Amino acid sequence: GHHGSGNATDLTKQILADPRVASFIQEHSLSQDEIKRSLPKFNQFLVECRKVKEGDASYIAKGYEPILTMNEGYADVTYKETRQLKEQQEQQAIAKRINLVSLPQSYRKITFADIALDDVARVDTFESLVDFVANYPSPDQKGLYIYGDMGVGKSFMLAAMAHELSETKKVATTIIHYPSFTIDVKNGIKDGSVKEQIDAVKQAEVLVLDDIGAEQFSSWIRDDVLQVILQHRMIEELPTFFTSNYSFADLEAKLSNGRQGDETWQAKRVMERIRFLAKEVHLKGVNRR
């Protein structure tokens, strides 16, 4: 009856009075006919907008918001990513470029903003990392060999650098707990995966060898694993960082102490590569743990 059509007109008025709909009609100079054909879509648009606003569970397109677009002669509803979804996807993409091996996954979330600079000793190291990221890629990009006591935040700083590189330069960094890696490689002898494991590490875009010197000494690891990785990265000029409890001199002494007694030459050869790849930095400071 008459009553029903009255309601329909009211609804139409209500729809057309909505500022988002009104401005869309104006922007696309819709004719009366086009407006009429668009009414169901205008209605759908407003219903969906209301659901989004109220956080309605029946709203299907999570992370997308409804928008009006022009189709052939009538309006249509499409969905565009919301800022939150975009940000969420960006965060996931950033985290994906940080490859952690035998290290806590929480390292993915550390950023430069998380680094405590309460300590002058830390500022220089921090600034070197900031510069490295800002200038990446550059022809003379040397990594850092950061050494210092346990718990001063060496790995933490490099995890933050990896995050920054991923976010600002879309660069992938592999951070490896070196002592665990040496055990994995030794175990790889049984299943023939040694070469594969070494290749993955030596080809990483940016590499961090964490806690070098803490591994159980082995001439084979030194000469056929570490040396091979460093040699490749040196020739290909791939940025390489290290953390250690040992200075260059102490690491060299540790690497010389082989079964054959004096293996100074082999140790020197490895150290030459490390020196070529990275600048030695002593991170002093308070234990952060």
Task: Enumerate the language-model features and the residues they cover.
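N-terminal nucleic-acid engagement/recognition segments and initiation subdomains in replication
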Residues: 1-63
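Interdomain "pre-motor" coupling segment immediately N-terminal to P-loop NTPase/helicase cores
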Residues: 47-103
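Dynamic helix-loop-helix/coil hinge segments at AAA+ ATPase domain boundaries and subdomain interfaces
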Residues: 98-125
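Short glycine-rich substrate-engagement loop in P-loop NTPases that contacts/grips substrate
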Residues: 120-129, 141, 147, 162-203, ...
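Walker A/P-loop nucleotide-binding motif
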Residues: 137-159
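Loop/turn-to-beta-strand initiation segments
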Residues: 171-172, 203-206, 236-242
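Walker B catalytic acidic pair
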Residues: 211-212
